[in-house]
Amino acid sequence: MFQPKKPANISLFSICMALILFASCTVVKQYPTNKPFVFKNSINVDGNISKDEKKRLELNLQNYWDDSLKVKMVTQFGIRTVIRNPNVYDSSAINSSITFMRSFLNSQGYYDVILNDTINIDTVKNQFRTTVLMNVQLGKNLTIDSLAFNFKSPDLQKIVVDNDKETQLKKGRPYSKQIIATELDKLVTLFRKNGYYRLNREDLVAVVDTTDISLLEITLDPFEQARQIAEASERRRLNPTVDVTIRERDTTEAFSKYYIGNVFYYPQARINDLPDSLMQMDFNIVFTRGNKTSKQNSPFIHFKPLDEHTYLQKGLLYNEERYFKTVNALSQLGTWNQIDVRTREITDTIHTLIPGDSSIAAQVRVDSINMLNFHFFLTPAQKYAISTDLEVSRNSGTILNGNLLGIANNITLRNRNVWREAIQSGTIIRNGIELSLANNTPLQTFQSSFSHTLSIPRLLAPWQSKRIQRLDAYKTVFNFAAAYTERRNFFRLRSVVGSWGYEWKKKNNIWLYKPLNLELYTLDTLKGLVAAFEKNPFLRTAFNTGYVVSQTLTFNTTFAGSKPNVSNYVRISVEEAGGLLGFIRSFHNKLYRYIKTEGEFRQLRSFRKTALAYRFFGGIGYNYSNDPKVGQSLPFFKQFVAGGPNSMRAWPLRQLGLGSSLVSDTSTTFKDRYGDIQLEMNFEYRFPIATISSVKIGSAIFTDIGNIWNLKNTVTNANSKLTWNRFARDIAIGVGSGLRFDFNYFLVRFDFAFKVKDPARIKNNGWINISDFEWRNKEFEIKGTDGKLLKRNNYAFQLGIGLPF
């Protein structure tokens, strides 16, 4: 009898060995024959510094090689290195490289530096491969001994003193030109927030002094002078320090304060209009309120949206932060494609009454002040826009149908200026089907939906707070949706959803609160689902129908990591349903009562050409109604699912879990799994392969770890409940790789993943057995309703749009 195990193992071993050999070699193409060429360069930094500082310096110093010593290296398939047209080695380039590197190190505060080069030439056939190693020995880094701000203007000096806690120039901190430049930039920003409109970086100067103050003491003894000089030299060698003084340059125009004047809006400006011409033009509709004026030729926009999103109040000091906040707020309304701003400097007068006395009459003092008028030229976006999108997704390896192909079409109609209030309206009509490629009846799922959203650029509430001015953006959102979904032979689901909520943003923090979310569902159970209920009674608890009246709160934020190449994303969501209405008797047996929370953390570490991405997700939902009519678990449309192109990619969509239960895997009917708890971790290493025309081709190596579970104990499906003594057994692990085709506007992703640890695998505690490797799980045979043997693959192919996370 033919045994496929041994050839499979040999093939797998051969593939691994071939990949190792393929990755370990560096190929040189179009090299100069019989001449030494630059094959490799490297930098080694030694000194009393931290590992992170050593790594930073070595990475940055790579940019300071002379051009003729740089290696023209290309990475193929993420693992193979190719050098094309290498430079002929030129020994004179060593000196220029040392000069460049020394200048960079000086700018970082390292002055006592020794650089030595080592040259090795290896002969490979007719190749003279030259390796250049630069050894860098660092002395002690300069540290800041003192910091002083010496501004002649009392106003500038007061601003700096009031904010000196924010400075990074602290005593004992390492000195570098970069930290000085950063401090000057912060001061410019600080001054421009306090009225100094014309001030820029060139108007400030930082004086760095390394003089030992003890040398300034007067002494007539030449031996004492020699001793002081020797001691000062030794102190500089052991502990080199600098004194930093920041002051203004000798200019006057930049240090004049400016105040906010008038604001003018031109909401119908065209892209080719000249701003100076528009400012001189007469308009049919001119509306003024306070210091703000809107100029239009025809009714286009009401004044209120412009006024509410402008943060420039007349008479206040010019504040660059509030200026940019205004520009961003108007841009985010969505009614205009482009916003251009012109400022005009004017001089105004202030009359101050000076009271007199019995001997001197009262006087009026006239002072001149500088003011700024702002002219906003807003180019409208196309009011109506219609678009259509085609979505395609595929996941293979499913137990039920072999291969599933999803196709959906979205038609979107947008109105960017409803009722001339800058209200954004979006209507989406979606129709989709799910096809089985290995079934006599290909159509498995049909879905049709209609949704409409109104986004109003203000917070509609019975009260108003001045705190709203502190927000960067805010809006009220109304949403309505109706959908129909039919799973062949299993169910027909109809739903109507309506919600009202508020969304606001402060810096990188975004909040979304929905005080009212109403969801109505009706479910028709067909014969396939009825049969599944008979074999798996636990499914009934999830497929009961009821109403959802809930409120939700979602928070998400992005923030930088401890290093500049690290970015983080956090999302937390809480939903509560039926808390108060559930006490009303008329809602018994109709209303779901539950609380559901979920959290997500993502981190991206970007390197020169590659990236490392992590994702951690956890969610739990608890049904506290204990009403048998609406079930003891979350409704299935609120439960968690795993598998598919964006979650646990070694499993098809909704085909992982629950826990290590085999109920769904051994069933010949309904295979979808829904859980009250989900835990998942994803790790992905992304790297480029090639660029063909304008299409960037990349790849990734990834692993997915997680599962879904029931929260409450189910007698008929005990292994579906999360328990700590079975937690390790329940965890699923998949590994894989894939291709990504980046077309700039969208990304198409093909992923292949293998089940390294499958909770539904009985043998070896779920782990794959390398010595008994199989592409399919043959532990037990399952026949479908047509009598054919159903396949349980240990792998899955996924087709997705965009990155998985």
Task: Report the location of each language-model feature.
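Interaction-mediating elements
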Residues: 2, 26-332
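Bacterial N-terminal signal peptides that target proteins for export
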Residues: 2-13
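C-terminal motif of bacterial Sec signal peptides marking the signal peptidase cleavage site
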Residues: 21-24
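Flexible glycine-/small-residue-rich
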Residues: 47, 134-140, 151-153, 244-248, ...
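Beta-rich nucleic-acid/ligand-interaction surfaces
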Residues: 121-128, 206-224, 324, 344-374, ...
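Gram-negative/organellar outer-membrane beta-barrel architecture
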Residues: 156-160, 299-300, 316-571, 604, ...
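C-terminal outer-membrane beta-barrel translocator/porin domains of Gram-negative envelope proteins
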Residues: 393-401, 414, 512-697, 701-726, ...
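Conserved active-site loop/cleft motifs that coordinate metal ions or position small ligands
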Residues: 700-702, 747-753
